[in-house]
């Protein structure tokens, strides 16, 4: 890895460099693990005490920190430390783009596929008929891109990614290992009215529906993804039944996320690990779904809504609402219910005592 000098790194972070700004940095490290050519990350006050006993000569610090008192030779001072970590990690992360642009001889590329300049395509990749791959694409190994799919410039597809038929993806797309974009949706129907339909309508009564076989509804739509979208490891975005499943610009998906058929997600949504969104549900812009949130089918979640971890959304959510619990309700309501439940044993003891006192007085 090439070494970076302090002043160049500070410029990349739009930060202030102080001290010996010509010192070279190899990598970032926590203070207790830092060596003399590392950048110690000590933006939290809890880490400052660890710098003195470390080998670190340079540290990333919050603005206003007295770096001269920490026995450092130089420092980079930032106004918003967590935001600075975005630029810092981008500069220091050399994993994806190492090596010359090339197409591995064990890759299989259809003659009609259009591969723009700057591509790096690893072994055992299979690129189908009519595929369009934008400039500077980086593909790991064992990746498949099915016929007719189009991917914009500066894409990064990690090992084992699967892109289905006729998927449309914008620029600067990142897919972590094992992500699957464009598999068929989970959609089945019975010849006659099923027990599932009866239960949904009556909230519990199967009405003696006879067992039936499930017939497949094929997925004739595809998936359309905007620019600057990231999809985590082993996450799945299913293709639509008739219309496309749609993902807006700037959306970020954690690992193990399931997006059902016909789902429409607005721009800049953040979807955490193990979230499941059932078919034909629409999310507005800037929605955040905490880990293990489940969203039922055919619902609408408004702009800027947020769900806490393990929330189960069974009804529409208004814009700007913060939801928690199963079933999902306003967070403050859910917390009040939780507090009340915690008081319930004491309340029952008080009632029992009142009944006992009343019986004795009679």
Residue spans of the language-model regions?
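Structural signal for interior beta-strand "rungs" in well-ordered beta-sheet cores
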Residues: 41, 102-194, 201-330
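Terminal amphipathic alpha-helical/low-complexity segments used for targeting or macromolecular assembly
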Residues: 1-106, 167, 172, 178-179, ...
């Amino acid at each position: 890895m090439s070494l970076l000098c302090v002043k160049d790194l500070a410029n990349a972070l739009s930060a202030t460099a102080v001290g010996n700004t010509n010192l070279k940095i190899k990598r970032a490290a926590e203070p207790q693990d830092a060596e003399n050519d590392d950048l110690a990350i000590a933006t939290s006050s809890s880490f400052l005490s660890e710098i003195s006993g470390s080998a670190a000569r340079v540290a990333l610090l919050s603005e206003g920190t007295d770096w001269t008192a920490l026995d450092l030779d130089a420092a980079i001072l930032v106004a918003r430390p967590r935001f600075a970590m975005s630029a810092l990690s981008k500069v220091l992360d050399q994993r994806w783009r190492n090596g010359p642009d090339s197409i591995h001889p064990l890759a299989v590329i259809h003659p009609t596929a259009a591969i723009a300049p700057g591509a790096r395509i690893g072994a055992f990749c299979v690129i189908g008929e009519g595929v369009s791959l934008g400039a500077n694409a980086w593909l790991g190994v064992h990746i498949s891109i099915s016929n007719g799919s189009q991917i914009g410039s500066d894409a990064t597809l990690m090992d084992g990614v699967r892109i289905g038929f006729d998927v449309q993806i914008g620029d600067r797309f990142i897919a972590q290992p094992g992500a699957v974009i464009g598999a068929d949706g989970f959609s089945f129907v019975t010849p006659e009215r099923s027990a599932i339909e009866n239960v949904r309508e009556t909230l519990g009564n199967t009405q003696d529906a006879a067992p039936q076989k499930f017939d497949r509804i094929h997925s004739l739509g595809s998936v359309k993804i905007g620019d600057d979208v990231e999809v985590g490891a082993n996450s799945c975005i299913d293709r639509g039944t008739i219309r496309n499943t749609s993902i807006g610009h700037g959306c970020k998906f954690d690992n193990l996320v399931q997006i059902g058929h016909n789902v429409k997600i607005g721009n800049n949504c953040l979807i955490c690990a193990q979230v499941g969104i059932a078919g034909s549900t629409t999310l507005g812009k800037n929605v955040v779904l905490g880990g293990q949130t489940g969203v039922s089918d055919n619902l609408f979640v408004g702009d800027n809504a947020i769900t806490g971890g393990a929330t189960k959304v069974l009804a529409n959510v208004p814009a700007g609402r913060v939801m928690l619990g199963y079933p999902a309700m306003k967070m403050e309501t859910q917390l009040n219910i939780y507090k009340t439940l915690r008081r319930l044993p004491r309340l029952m003891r008080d009632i029992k005592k009142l009944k006992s006192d009343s019986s004795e007085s009679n």
